[in-house]
Structures are given as C-alpha cells and as structure tokens.
C-alpha cells in the first residue's frame, strides 16, 4: 500500500479513514508515520546516518549554528524535520520497498518521504546573502568559515532557477554581518527591491539597526525576524561575544519597533534551547515577546564541531521540547498570535523546530 499524505491526511492534521491517531504514533497496520512525539524524538537526536542510495542531493547550510553541515529534510504524516547527515547517529535512514524509513536500534521509528529542497529548505527560496560575520557568537559556525557574499546577479540567478522549476512561492533572505549591520541592511534592501518583480512574499532575518524595520518594510518585505538568541542575560553576554553596543536590550527594542511597522504575526525571533537556560526563563521570554506581538521560535541548539571547546551546550530532550512547545502554543493563543499565518522563513518550514500551531 502506498501512503499518500495529501489524500490520507485532513487539513487539521488528523488522519482519516483507516488512519487513526494513537497516543504516540500514527499507525496503519505496522507502518508508523510522524506525529509531534516522534518529531520531538528526531529533533532531540538531530542526526541521521543516511543510506548512500538516498543521498541524491543533500543540503548544506550556510547560516547559523548548522553552517557547513550537510542535512536532509524528511516528511511524514504532515510533519517535516531536518536532520544533520552523519554516520555517528543511532538513527539510520534507509529505503524499504519503495518507502523511506528511519530506523532506531534496527527497529522502524517512522516512515515517509525525502522532502526536496528548493533553495536551502523545501517550498521556499531561502538565500543566505553574507556567509561572513564580524561577530563571534559561540553557538554559530559562520565566523569560522568567512565565506562568500552573494552578488545581486547570483541571487537573481537562484530565484530565476526556482521560478523556472515552477516552485517559486516565497523568498527569504538571511545574512551574517560582514562589516557592519548598517552595510548589511543596505545590501538586503537593494536585493529585496530587486526581487519585488516576482510578486511573492519576502521574509528577512537579519541583525537590526535603528531604522531597519522601516527600511525593510518600504523595500517590500512581508515579514521580519530579529533573533534574541536567548532571554537569559548572563548567557547572552557569555555566548554573544563581539557585539559591542548591540545588546539584548537593543534587539528587544528593535523587535518592538518591528511590530509597530509590520504588525502582529509578522515578526518572529529565535530563542535557542540548550545553552543552559531554565524552562522558566524560556517561559518568561516567550511571554515577554508575545506581549509585544512577536512569535518566539524555539530552536534546539546545533552543537557544531567547528565550535568544539568554545561552548557548553546540551541538545534538549524530546520531553523538554514537547513541554516548551506546548507552553509556547498556549502563550501565543493567549496573545492572539497565529503561527499558521506566517508565510516565510522558519515558521512555515518547521524543519528545524517543533512548531506550535503546526506540529503541536
């Protein structure tokens, strides 16, 4: 029997017909499909050993903590997850009778399909402009590579390629800070103006400046993301190094201004989980942002081999991810924030996170 997600799964995430929801698994006979609990388990491990025959075109990240690492997107039961590809994992992705199956301890954990990447992630043209950064955040690999800065022609070439494939639905830009935040905003604004002709939603995740929100809005940006990284001030000072004059308070002020410019449900911010913060700190941080109109994205820490010895971090457990995501879901509901309305970047992708309103 072939599993067809589009036909077998309702819009509300509940399977129909013979597909019934158990407390821990989606099952059809002995076949298991992903739900929130399984996705949390996959995210907690974060890595998978992939059978070589399935490695047709793995993705390599150029942004954030995962920069330089190969990964693969897997989809099942209406859920999507992104996993780092490495032989050093208790999970193994194999092909069985035409299906893609993830095994744990040689037992089937979940089955589904490999989700093809459009540009950086499925269903989005997600482009890293500057693969360089003047800052030295200890959780991020980008400063270790100091890669290239894409020209406008290179960006347009990527977008045109996606357009010709028929998959151009949204465009998202992210960027390191190659020289100064102000110079980066100048570059992003120019690139956004150049892609307006495609008439698709545009999201931008950058480091803010005093006037970045208004400039990005005027250029044609739909949604914006400024990452706080952590709401624990002591951790922020320890891991977000080299940000002289650019404090956590500055980012929070910038987020407040972004909501003024873009409106509720159009602004988001990453909170990294696994840097040593308490659950109570996460709760207070999520609520602080939600009161502003900002949607918090809880991002499990990727412990990069390129930062070995520079940071103490622990990948969150499945139980912790579920607990914090359910808490976030309830807080967002309290402040009338709707993840499902997001059109660009991480919230609709869901690959790296357990996402409230979509996964839970």
Please place each PLM-identified region on the residue numbering:
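Flexible, acidic/Gly-rich N-terminal and inter-domain linker regions that tether
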Residues: 2-6, 10-123
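A C-terminal junction/extension of Radical SAM enzymes
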Residues: 59, 266, 320-360
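Canonical Radical SAM [4Fe-4S] cluster-binding loop centered on the CxxxCxxC motif
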Residues: 119-152
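Short beta->alpha linker loops
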Residues: 132, 207-208, 277
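Core AdoMet radical
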Residues: 141-157, 163-190, 194-254, 268, ...
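Short, electropositive alpha-helical surface patch
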Residues: 185-193, 225, 276-296, 352-360
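Conserved C-terminal portion of the radical SAM core fold
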Residues: 232, 249-309, 322-338
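Flexible glycine/acidic-rich beta-alpha junction loops that bind and position SAM and/or redox cofactors
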Residues: 234-242, 273-277, 297-319, 340-357
